[in-house]
Amino acid sequence: MWNYTDKVMDHFMNPRNVGEVENPDGVGEVGNAACGDALKLTFKLDDEGRIADVKFKTFGCASAIASSSALTELIKGMTLEEAEKVTNQDIVKLLGTLPEAKMHCSVMGMEALQSAIAKYRGLPDPFANDDDHEGKLICRCFGVTDVKILKVARENDLHNAEEITHYCKAGGACGACLGDIQRILDDMWKFKAAQK
């Protein structure tokens, strides 16, 4: 059993802003229900360009529901410029903490928000799982590229493959890519150390 904070339990048992915004300005979808986690985030802007309404639908665990609920509370009233600066760590901070093995739930919320903002601006979805997606596919089970692994590692100061699994699920199914993930991390941190 996971050890959840009172805030996590409150957002899980009483999630805020569940559903879909009618005629949304932005829609972001990440994850895959077949893999166990999926999130759809919709928002509507007011006349001043602030997020007036935001809702979510998620297929996932208590941490996924709580993270999504907390995210909607966090960004309500923000401009898109302010909202796009929200990180998964901001979501975790609002909740108090999340078990390390559930950190991917906060990352999923941040990605859904970034996806919705990109689509609103007419930009490509940065998290689309298609052949044009940037980077080399490393984890076939969860569709995670080297670019995403590097991004998550830099943003969260992650140094081993197990930590990456907790944050973006890469390596969490068959495990065949764990060696590749560790090599990517080792190379990145060696390069960063050499730059100092």
Question: Over which residues does each language-model region extend?
Answer:
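Stable alpha-helical structural segments in soluble proteins, enriched in small hydrophobic residues
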Residues: 7, 109-123
